[in-house]
Swiss-Prot record:
Its EC number is 2.1.1.213. GO terms for biological process: tRNA methylation. InterPro entries: DNA_methylase_N6_adenine_CS, RlmKL-like_Mtase, RlmKL-like_Mtase_CS, SAM-dependent_MTases_sf. Coiled coil: none annotated. It comes from Methanothermococcus thermolithotrophicus. This is Probable tRNA (guanine(10)-N2)-dimethyltransferase. It catalyses: guanosine(10) in tRNA + 2 S-adenosyl-L-methionine = N(2)-dimethylguanosine(10) in tRNA + 2 S-adenosyl-L-homocysteine + 2 H(+). Its main location: cytoplasm.
Amino acid sequence: KLAMCLVNLSRLKKGDVLLDPFCGTGGFLIEGGFMGLKLIGSDIDDDMVNGTLLNLKSYNLTEHIISIKKWNAGDIKSFLKQLNVKYVDGIVTDPPYGISTSAKGNIEEIFNNLGDVLKKDGYLVFASSRKINLDLELMEMYELYIHKSLTRYIHVYKKTDN
């Protein structure tokens, strides 16, 4: 349910390109595939990448895949360059809690770099355990109470310039 909600918040339409740079087992990519989106995903963990591919196959969504690959989200530009993709239409992701140990750079730096590969008027939608301020325009933020020691913040940022 949360995956569908976040993908819907990205305002993508059929045929658009969705990027999830922390794809895990592919929940956002699966929802994107159901919506007819083209899918690009990466994760730093081989097992997660393999799980994403298996899950997309089990839902018969492999025809939507542009690329799913092991890659560090802190260097997403070079990943997209290999695909001859300069910009994506939208980004939906949920970085791991231990982000500082699993991706180079801090989370703000990584997300601002993601903004560089986002098309003008595209949306970056993500969940995190704290409020995160970026160079993009914050359109919406939602607090999702999980339990007494965990609240998730759903951020919806828009790229308003190139």
